[in-house]
Amino acid sequence: MEKIIIYGGTGYIGKFMVRASLSFSHPTFIYARPLTPDSTPSSVQLREEFRSMGVTIIEGEMEEHEKMVSVLKQVDIVISALPFPMISSQIHIINAIKAAGNIKRFLPSDFGCEEDRIKPLPPFESVLEKKRIIRRAIEAAALPYTYVSANCFGAYFVNYLLHPSPHPNRNDDIVIYGTGETKFVLNYEEDIAKYTIKVACDPRCCNRIVIYRPPKNIISQNELISLWEAKSGLSFKKVHMPDEQLVRLSQELPQPQNIPVSILHSIFVKGDLMSYEMRKDDIEASNLYPELEFTSIDGLLDLFISGRAPPPTLAEFE
């Protein structure tokens, strides 16, 4: 059974990766920054929870090369779930993997769009370029890799688009970006994590791009809103934000506030997630494992109805 280390294992998608790794009985490690007096109680509690489940947590900085090398010599698979602001720091992981010499697979922090095939507005493009640089460094070092394009984190974007969780300042207006007809892919985070752990250990996925594009999870904003209204019994006022407004905001807002609007434009206006055909060498994840199945969008919305969905959060860009 492969030993798996997850960088960013206490972050948003990283938490799902850790739990998925444990669910498949992999010895699981996390490399995380040391806690500080400013660390939140939830951060402390999460680490205690993971330790109680058998996770080995190594605290260290990305610049601690010798420490990382010694840790990597104890594991087989490296998964990076680092957030946007730390994308470039993955070069330290690459250098440590090269020095350790034993790693069977490295999965860099992709998990969103397929960055080598799209060209979004400049603020988001600058983020993707950092990811491309990491990919090229992996290839130049001849490291065994798998690139995962998981598309949209399902619960994250349901929270963002539909704001289903009740709170005092809740606004029942729903913003529709562009016409609302553009198709995108919505995958539940728990499924993304399970498939990622599987592909990380699957010889068929070595040095390949794996795209999570299950046909049943391709949907438009208008379809998603209609499904949610029918399921929740609620009715919403729809406010359209046209293409031109998103482009203007991407130009006028300061960094990093201009990045989220550029992402919204890429997904919901340009349709970048569905803008390319699968290549012969691509692997579509839903065809790989008969014992696994992606949660349908209907099933994802049921999690919100029952109160079992992840709470709202926002990605970090600085």
Curated annotation (Swiss-Prot):
Catalytically driven reaction(s): eugenol + a carboxylate + NADP(+) = a coniferyl ester + NADPH; eugenol + acetate + NADP(+) = (E)-coniferyl acetate + NADPH
What are the catalytic residues? K131 (proton donor/acceptor)
Q: Name one Pfam family in it.
A: NmrA
Task: List the residue(s) that the UniProt entry marks as the site Required for activity.
Answer: I263
Q: Where is this site: Confers substrate specificity?
A: F84, I87
Query: Transmembrane region positions?
Result: none
The GO annotation for biological process reads: phenylpropanoid biosynthetic process
The family this protein is said to belong to: Belongs to the NmrA-type oxidoreductase family.
Record-given protein name: Eugenol synthase 1
Source organism per entry reads: Clarkia breweri
